[in-house]
Amino acid sequence: MKGIIYLEDGTVFYGTGFGKEGNEFGEIVFNTSMTGYQEILTDPSYAGQIINMTYPLIGNYGVNESVNQSKCVYAKGFIVKNIDENPSNYTSEINIDQMLKNMGVVGVFGVDTRSITKKIRSYGTMKCIISNGELSIEELKKMMDASNIVDDYVNTVSTKEIIHIAGNGNKVAVMDFGIKNDIIENLKERQCDITIFPYDTDYNEILNINPDGIFLSNGPGDPKSIPEAIENVKKLIGKRPMFGICLGHQIIALASGGNTYKLKYGHRGGNHGIYDVQRDKAYITAQNHGYAVDEESVLENGMIITHRNLNDGTVEGMKHKSIPLFSVQFHPEGAPGPTDTTYLFDQFVNL
């Protein structure tokens, strides 16, 4: 089955198709992780995107449903150099090709993924069509011209109903913008009594459960695309201790009077270095975001920068000077990636 990667600038890469047969449009991004392809695919933050893996060998240890970060794959496509259809791992249940077929995801392998990555780094994230169907280049061009990138997927990935997970510890209200399972597991490990709310839940309904703390989850797209959530968070700030991760971090910035902006090609992978200003220590972290917090705008609104990216100096963490409010851009839960910064969950429950 022929596979095609058609980029916004007209560049075409030919490979072999796998997974679901079809044609999908999305924003192409690259991920630098060497492992964790299953967690990456099932991370709701990739909604609407086509993931290009820089590491050349994908699928070596198979697929085990227990490590999925959500119930399905929201990404539009998956690009790899080589796939292993005969994995060797005692926990493996199916191979990567079967996973993509089961989840309805178009895949292409056998292309130069490093070349694609260099192009994204030079050009920035761009529109892309991934195809293993029967469309010609001319038909793919027409599809490209008629399509636009959408940065509002939170409504798609957020829970549609309130979910309660009983625990014996602190009562935590979670605003779900596309939460990963391992974040929930970290809260459960700390005995939290968890109530997960849809992203657009009114602030009064959240306060009605009398939570000890409020957690803002990760999620896909542009934080400015969900103004209703920003307005609710504005009204919640200062009412209870609050902690945000990834998209939740950006929403806290906006709700506090700060600003966010789109990065040229984002940070995605399990090997991103950050500096913890308060601990005077560097950590390797998992990251997955295309937007960042504008530093000056949050400093003007009572924030202190707590973490910085060691590659480009962007804001990776902040806290308020006088109220129990903090957030980080990276993923302390890893999944996939290091878990050296899970102390942040302890910091939250101890506020």
Curated annotation (Swiss-Prot):
Gene3D superfamilies: 3.40.50.880, Carbamoyl-phosphate synthase small subunit, N-terminal domain (3.50.30.20). Pathway: Amino-acid biosynthesis; L-arginine biosynthesis; carbamoyl phosphate from bicarbonate: step 1/1; Pyrimidine metabolism; UMP biosynthesis via de novo pathway; (S)-dihydroorotate from bicarbonate: step 1/3. The keyword Ligase applies. Belongs to the CarA family. Keywords: Amino-acid biosynthesis, Arginine biosynthesis, ATP-binding, Glutamine amidotransferase, Ligase, Nucleotide-binding, Pyrimidine biosynthesis. GO terms for biological process: 'de novo' pyrimidine nucleobase biosynthetic process; 'de novo' UMP biosynthetic process; glutamine metabolic process; L-arginine biosynthetic process. Its EC number is 6.3.5.5. Residues 171-351 form the Glutamine amidotransferase type-1 domain. The active site is at residues 246, 331, 333. Small subunit of the glutamine-dependent carbamoyl phosphate synthetase (CPSase). CPSase catalyzes the formation of carbamoyl phosphate from the ammonia moiety of glutamine, carbonate, and phosphate donated by ATP, constituting the first step of 2 biosynthetic pathways, one leading to arginine and/or urea and the other to pyrimidine nucleotides. The small subunit (glutamine amidotransferase) binds and cleaves glutamine to supply the large subunit with the substrate ammonia. Transmembrane segments: none annotated. L-glutamine binds at residues 45, 219, 221, 247, 250, 288, 290-291. It comes from the Bacteria. GO terms for molecular function: ATP binding; carbamoyl-phosphate synthase (glutamine-hydrolyzing) activity; glutaminase activity. Residues 1-171 are annotated as: CPSase. Composed of two chains; the small (or glutamine) chain promotes the hydrolysis of glutamine to ammonia, which is used by the large (or ammonia) chain to synthesize carbamoyl phosphate. Tetramer of heterodimers (alpha,beta)4. It catalyses: hydrogencarbonate + L-glutamine + 2 ATP + H2O = carbamoyl phosphate + L-glutamate + 2 ADP + phosphate + 2 H(+). The gene is carA. This is Carbamoyl phosphate synthase small chain.
